[in-house]
């Protein structure tokens, strides 16, 4: 299952998982046509796929989504908890609704989806023909789990919280052979941040923060997710893989600060 999978990074991850041979549930909250298009692309690789509409911040909808998945797909092996959004504002102007919406989707959504997945992982246990692990969870975080971001306090708080959520969950579940990791994308060309890259001036400014000198593409993250979910990464647990062109290297200090 990939949540928030009808656009951007989620879409790329869902397609890459299908290309790698996985059956895929494409979760989305709005945009039926886009979700169905992703499903058709995935089916083109000869695997099963279906689009499930659910708000990941809603406990009842998440429970119903997983119940449907168990009925139609039998089980779950990999959860990519990708759904996320921004509601930006200066701190003194930020409303409680903006705060709650971001925390609800970006952090509570991780909790609700992971809880359902872990219940199934523990019920089923390891299937050696499928994986060395009983289950894999990938939390889609951000470089802003460690980089402060003024004007985006709710978003950065959700990602910082996600880091400790992921690590605590990984610690708790490791004895059950369940792996939990995060991916922290940096500047990536997606609909959520169009204003940061859609003009030359904006792009040039953004590149001052990226030592590698190019914007990331959703496929950069998708390929990382496929690897992290595979048995090639079986000994990796409780870690964040930053896919960021070096944004977390504090580029302002490259010339002595």
Report each predicted region and the residues it spans.
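Conserved glycine-rich cofactor-binding loop
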Residues: 6-7
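Substrate-binding pocket helix/loop in short-chain dehydrogenase/reductase
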Residues: 90-91, 98-103, 206
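Active-site helix of classical SDR
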Residues: 114, 158, 166
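Residue(s) in the substrate-gating loop at a strand-loop-helix junction
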Residues: 142
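Short, small/polar-rich loop/turn modules that mediate ligand/substrate recognition or access, typified
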Residues: 174, 179, 236-238
